[in-house]
Amino acid sequence: MVFSRRGGLGARDLLLWLLLLAAWEVGSGQLHYSIPEEAKHGTFVGRVAQDLGLELAELVPRLFRVASKTHRDLLEVDLQNGILFVNSRIDREEPCQWSAECSIHLELIADRPLQVFHVEVKVKDINDNPPVFRGREQIIFIPESRLLNSRFPIEGAADADIGANALLTYTLSPSDYFSLDVEASDELSKSLWLELRKSLDREETPELHLLLTATDGGKPELQGTVELLITVLDVNDNAPLFDQAVYRVLLLETTANGTLMTTLNASDADEGVNGEVVFSFDSGISRDIQEKFKVDSSSGEIRLIDKLDYEETKSYEIQVKAVDKGSPPMSNHCKVLVKVLDVNDNAPELAVTSLYLPIREDAPLSTVIALITVSDRDSGANGQVTCSLMPHVPFKLVSTFKNYYSLVLDSALDRESLSVYELVVTARDGGSPSLWVTARVSVEVADVNDNAPAFAQPEYTVFVKENNPPGCHIFTVSARDADAQENALVSYSLVERWVGERALSNYVSVHAESGKVYALQPLDHEEVELLQFQVSARDAGMPPLGSNVTLQVFVLDENDNAPALLAPRVGGTIGAVSELVPRLVGAGHVVAKVRAVDADSGYNAWLSYELQPAAGGARIPFRVGLYAGEISTTRVLDEADLSRYRLLVLVKDHGEPALTVTATVLVSLVESGQAPKASSRASVGVAGPEAALVDVNVYLIIAICAVSSLLVLTLLLYTALRCSVPPTEGACVPGKPTLVCSSALGSWSNSQQRRQRVCSSEGPPKTDLMAFSPGLSPSLNTSERNEQPEANLDLSGNPRQPNPDWRYSASLRAGMHSSVHLEEAGILRAGPGGPDQQWPTVSSATPEPEAGEVSPPVGAGVNSNSWTFKYGPGNPKQSGPGELPDKFIIPGSPAIISIRQEPANSQIDKSDFITFGKKEETKKKKKKKKGNKTQEKKEKGNSTTDNSDQ
């Protein structure tokens, strides 16, 4: 490092001064070098990399460079060795003119990370400019009448150098008449005078030629010369005389044009025209002075004619000449020194350089974003500039050196909150009033993948009908990513899983860009009711971020499966039933049962049975249960009936459109003691050949009659034992009876008129036993029912046996096989009833709907673990949405079912006891009912109709 040295210091003082200077440089972070002006290209200035502590290997990767705007081409750094060298000719007089000190300020910048270094290079002046006079000669007119020691001003030379190189000494060629008088003024300028040493005689010497030489103080010395041409004038021997040799004027730089600066006063002792004085600027005055000032030739007033600028010129030296009108004219000179005072008329200048944009939103704090340079052409407090940044932004200004600031990151950034910051930087000077300037810096925040795609909700529910076409669009998922560009590009994919034994990708797919979900194959409700899977959304950032959303795809059932007939319980083919019916059976006797199942669900699987009308419109003595599929007699068969009936039962579901299947049932009526030959041949929807009857084995009929007689006797004995016990209210075993009541119209009530008890003589109370009372005709009103209390009594005055009809639900019927017998399943058949009779029923896990049931079976939306009261067509009352039917019963409810604790000695009312036995007990009860019906037929001619109504 080269430092300028100052002479006159001792070794100790010099060493101390050097140490202090080095400490100041380390603290300030600025390097100082010095070079002479006019240095050649490649001249060594300093080892910048070494002095800054930078490795040579990192200069090129970090783009180490000179960033100065004004003097960038003068100096350059060699990136191979880190040396600062002269790049082009440096003329000190060009950037610094006549300044005492001349320095070149450089900014050295290194990237990754961004660093700024300041270098000050002092340019030493060399004596490369000789003194220069304005012209090659100066003409001086001197009257011959001038006295000895008279002085005549002459113009000196100017030297573009500074310091000792600009200190001029003048010498005059030898002359008998004149000598050179040099006068140093307090303005560091010299005034030259020719002093008359010998009287002039124009006639003797009209002209004199002298040579004035100016020599500077440089080494080597340089000289400049000018020829002085002295013309001796005659007569007018008194020159004008100024009252002051020097006039001093102070002007503000904002002084208006036309302002009077001063008035010169000069007098001439001569008379007449020789005493008239004319003022004018000296002929050697500069053009700049002539453009800014004007002197009145007669009055001597000097006025300002152009705007002053302190920053351009701080002072002016004006030479004014006063010339009389004599012949030859005589003149005198004075000096007007104009000092310009600074006014705060220049706003600060602000420059933003080295923008490091865009800045990543995860950039660390104190990251340098831009360099800001401020300046003010004013001086003093008017030129002191402070820089500030708009508030409430995540940035701040850090002052590095005088008039240099760095824009750095002060707090964390979030591009999703604000992607571009429009910053306003203000530079304000210290004047009064102060002036300021603003600059806008647009800081763009670069996105970082810090946001995962987000769905509007975590789960979606989709309903799709089955049998959809392949490639059907079923849903569209959409996720939003708050990032930008590729970080916000969302792609969708399935989260693979297994659905049963098949991969999820066999069922659905998702479009990677649009998020549309497609069904790849037709969905089957019977195979998959619910398809639950996840769709993943991932962005294209590095590293990628993602999130999942759950889709629940419910496959809605369509009526795409027709009812299928089940094979008979014993032998036979599907859709063909052949039955033998004795002619002695009464109304309501179950002849056969048509069984069918539907693979659909809900209403699409709810089956109903219809008996097709006979050919020719003939009436047939049979009917089929609307929902049970049981074919029963509608009246007592007689001899007038045909011996064979071919019944067509239409089974259809409740889908849209409804699908059907037809079953053929061949019913043969046989007389007692005959052995009909039975064969069943039928097909679905097509009648086959009529089955031939075969003789009935005599032994089989005898066995049946014997068993029937035994059952009748057992039932009579049992009834007699029950009737022998006197009726007692609540005569059930304490803690065991369960009371279930029903009204005559099929709605549940606690009526005293229609109350029955169901008790069990042993074992725990059975809450699943129920007693039904026969329904009355809906045409009977309350008064009619009160007037006929005996309508519910048999011939002996005892209450009639209830007629419960337990059925399997459709969901259980679908799994029944041909080998399953309804009797073996513990089903108690219904008693006789008319074709229009409808019964309120209770559906549970085991019973199936009766003909009067109008709600779908289990599997069609009804909970299979509840008992629900149903109304048939005879009782059209329907409950509104969200409410229960009147007198609705739920097993175990304390309002309907009560368990009474009777005394130990209480009697059981056996007449009210009903139980559900096995197959033999069922047959006994059937035969007993048939006997009762026969007796009633004899006593009443229309008993069949009455029993049907009951």
From Swiss-Prot:
Domain Cadherin: 30-133, 157-242, 243-350, 351-455, 456-565, 588-678
Extracellular side stretches: 30-697
GO MF term list: calcium ion binding
Glycosylation sites: 257, 265, 548
Record localization: Cell membrane
Record field: compositional bias (Basic and acidic residues): 909-923
Top-level division of the source organism's lineage: Eukaryota
UniProt keyword list: Calcium, Cell adhesion, Cell membrane, Glycoprotein, Membrane, Repeat, Signal, Transmembrane, Transmembrane helix
SUPFAM superfamilies found in the cross-reference section: Cadherin-like (SSF49313)
UniProt repeat feature PXXP, residue ranges: 734-737, 799-802, 832-835, 873-876, 891-894
Location of the region described as Disordered in the Swiss-Prot/TrEMBL record: 752-808, 827-889, 901-950
Any one GO CC term of the record: plasma membrane
Transmembrane segments: 698-718
Alphabetical GO biological process terms: cell adhesion; homophilic cell adhesion via plasma membrane adhesion molecules; nervous system development
Membrane topology field: Single-pass type I membrane protein
Pfam families in the record: Cadherin (PF00028), Cadherin_2 (PF08266), Cadherin_tail (PF15974)
Keyword flag Repeat: yes
Region (5 X 4 AA repeats of P-X-X-P) residue spans: 734-894
Main location: membrane
Role description: Potential calcium-dependent cell-adhesion protein. May be involved in the establishment and maintenance of specific neuronal connections in the brain.
Name of this chain's protein: Protocadherin alpha-1
Source species: Pan troglodytes (Chimpanzee)
